[in-house]
Every structure is written in C-alpha cells, then in structure tokens.
C-alpha cells in the first residue's frame, strides 16, 4: 500500500492558562490498482495524528470500477462549495490537474485525465470531491 499525506492543519485553543495546540492530518492510501482510502487523524502530536490518519485511511478503502488506466467518460461531483470536473484524455496528454487531484489519481493508477475545479479549492474538500466523482463510475 502506498501512502500520501495531503495536509497537516494546526488548531489553537486559547484557554485561561495559555494556548493548547492540536494537529489534524489528512492522508490517502492506495495501491495503484483502483483502491483508495481517505483518513483524518487528530492529536496533540504531529506524528501521532499522521499515524492515526493512515490507520483510518486503511480502514476506509474503497474499490473503484473501471478497466484501464483511463476514466471512461466525463465525471462530475460536488462537496460543500467544491465542484470537480474530470474529463477523459488520451495517453499523450497525461495528467492535467491540480496538486491534490493529481495525488488522488496517481495513487489509484490513473495517468491520463484533464480536470477542472470550480468554487473552493480547499485541499480536503478537493480530495473528497475527487473520490466521490471516481466512485460514480459504473462497471
């Protein structure tokens, strides 16, 4: 299984005695054979939150249904204020996508897609939206 860390976010809680920091890590797990998992972990330590996110991603693995390394037709998904459009492309074109869409597509083994994002480009929302779009493929 291949692991990718998407984002680490630091959250500060202000209390009477000072500040309390906690960290949220978001990661994806896949095997380049149409399997992908998304996980988020929270902790007061960075490494612990990363470890938790990988464990949750391994538990949430989703199998996608398509044959080759190319998506068969146009896909669209919406999550919160993010809209992701995925268009099939030739092998010559390769991946034309944002950083986070590329990470998701690489980890499932798709290497020729053109994508467009409308609305919010928040990393976590883009990843969730891309996985939603890919899960809409019918066998």
Curated annotation (Swiss-Prot):
Cited InterPro entries: Ribosomal_Su5_D2-typ_SF, Ribosomal_uS5, Ribosomal_uS5_C, Ribosomal_uS5_N, Ribsml_uS5_D2-typ_fold_subgr
One of the record's GO molecular function terms: structural constituent of ribosome
Pfam families named among the record's database cross-references: Ribosomal_S5, Ribosomal_S5_C
Function: With S4 and S12 plays an important role in translational accuracy. Located at the back of the 30S subunit body where it stabilizes the conformation of the head with respect to the body.
Family: Belongs to the universal ribosomal protein uS5 family.
Self-association and partners: Part of the 30S ribosomal subunit. Contacts proteins S4 and S8.
Domain comment (free text): The N-terminal domain interacts with the head of the 30S subunit; the C-terminal domain interacts with the body and contacts protein S4. The interaction surface between S4 and S5 is involved in control of translational fidelity.
Protein name: Small ribosomal subunit protein uS5
């Amino acid at each position: 299984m291949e692991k990718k860390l998407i984002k680490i976010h630091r959250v500060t809680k202000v209390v009477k005695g000072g500040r309390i920091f906690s960290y949220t890590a978001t990661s994806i797990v896949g095997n380049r054979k149409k399997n992908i998992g998304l996980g988020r972990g929270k902790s007061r330590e960075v490494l612990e939150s990363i470890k938790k996110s990988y464990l949750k991603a391994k538990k949430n693995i989703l199998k996608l249904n398509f044959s080759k390394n190319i998506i068969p037709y146009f896909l669209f998904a919406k999550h919160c204020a993010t809209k992701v459009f995925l268009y099939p492309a030739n092998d010559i074109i390769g991946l034309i996508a944002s950083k986070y869409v590329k990470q998701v597509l690489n980890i499932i083994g798709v290497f020729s897609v053109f994508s467009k994002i409308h609305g919010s480009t928040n990393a976590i929302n883009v990843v969730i939206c891309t996985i939603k779009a890919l899960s809409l493929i019918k066998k």
